[in-house]
Amino acid sequence: MKIKMKFFSIFAVVAIMLSFAFSTLDRKIIVIDAGHGGIDFGASVENKTEKEIVAKIARKIQVLNLSSKVEIVLLRNGDSKMDLAERAAEVSKINPDLLISLHVNTSTNAAKNGIEAYVYDKSNFYEQSLEIAKGLVKAISNENLSEGKIQNARFFILRKAECPAVILEIGYLSNTENREYISSDSGQSVVAGRILEFINK
């Protein structure tokens, strides 16, 4: 009886370890890079700052994630300044399945509005990045954020990423309607929820 109990105990431990190993292998790691931070405020209009808005959206994405198959890693957790080289090095160390860098736009044209995205067309992951960018822009756009274009760009974080990578420009602070929406708790929750919903597809 003791031998049988010992056998079943060992079997149970092995089964748990194998289950954990396979669940870890199946898990996607998504890095969310909240742009700017610290003394770098990014875009700023009427006391609304880019660094604060994107940090709040990033945190909401992490908090809302209940999937065991997706791990959300925040590149900037808190109001700290990280230069581009530090960000790229940290992303490389994490080795994620996807990098999403969150930003907010601004323009001298106050009528300009909506969500846009950037990808790097010389990346080994260009096709994947482009499809992800299209999907994210479509998923987030609504009556408050119009569906904007996808552009190619040589931004440092995109050039250095060794995985699919997208920069999201979530609305225009210079546009009154966009500013009110993306600076509100409800608007940020909707944006975060739609990003997460797309990731979990």
Regions found by a protein language model. Name each.
Residues 71-73, 116, 146-149, 164:
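Conserved beta-strand segments of alpha/beta enzyme cores
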Residues 5, 10-28:
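Bacterial Sec-dependent signal peptides at the C-terminal "C-region" and cleavage site
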Residues 31-33, 42, 101, 105-109, ...:
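Active-site-adjacent mobile loop/cap segments within catalytic or ligand-binding domains
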Residues 127-151:
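Active-site-adjacent substrate-binding region
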Residues 25-134:
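Catalytic-core regions of hydrolytic enzymes
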Residues 1-3:
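N-terminal secretory signal peptides that target proteins for export/translocation
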